[in-house]
From Swiss-Prot:
Gene3D superfamilies for the chain: Cysteine proteinases
Lineage of producing organism: Eukaryota, Viridiplantae, Streptophyta, Embryophyta, Tracheophyta
One Pfam family linked to the record: Peptidase_C1
Protein name, entry field: Chymomexicain
Any one GO molecular-function label of the UniProt entry: cysteine-type peptidase activity
Native source species: Jacaratia mexicana
Function in brief: Cysteine protease.
Alphabetically ordered keywords of this record: Disulfide bond, Hydrolase, Protease, Signal, Thiol protease
Active site residues according to the UniProt entry: C25, H160, N176
Amino acid sequence: YPESIDWRDKGAVTPVKNQNPCGSCWAFSTVATVEGINKIRTGKLISLSEQELLDCDRRSHGCKGGYQTGSIQYVADNGGVHTEKEYPYEKKQGKCRAKEKKGTKVQITGYKRVPANDEISLIQGIGNQPVSVLHESKGRAFQLYKGGIFNGPCGYKNDHAVTAIGYGKAQLLDKNSWGPNWGEKGYIKIKRASGKSEGTCGVYKSSYFPIKGYR
């Protein structure tokens, strides 16, 4: 795996989006990973619909929170996810309108879990494609992050999904869904060496990525 990578440089990351005021980070994280692998496999970067997951993923709980696995599985089971343009974000859960929407969907075949609490496995995963990761984000330090390599203070009770889109020797590079005015233009650098197997803010505990074949 490469010493460092930033999937933005390879055109595999859409502009930073904003979930607020809805607790739909899970949908944004999943969608960003699907946008990433789709660009890597097809050469096309297409902004996809978080709203479809919010409305239609029955395993998750809308604006009250959801699951990386359930939402990635929804995309695999339902022939893909519609584009952002076709099914735009509304900041609240509505009824599922996926069947009424037209246009092509972006498909995946399934997902894989990165072994928990294993830094190198996660780095290898991110070397191949953007990966959905969880953080503890409720602390003031995380909320007010402005830049640099973040190493807390934070605990390990994961409550927020983001998308790891790169890394360097000292840090992971994560895309958040709190708009471009938060952090470093919407991104956060998380310290890699935390001295704990869970990683800084629990970032190594629960990571998933979608699988998409070449067609």
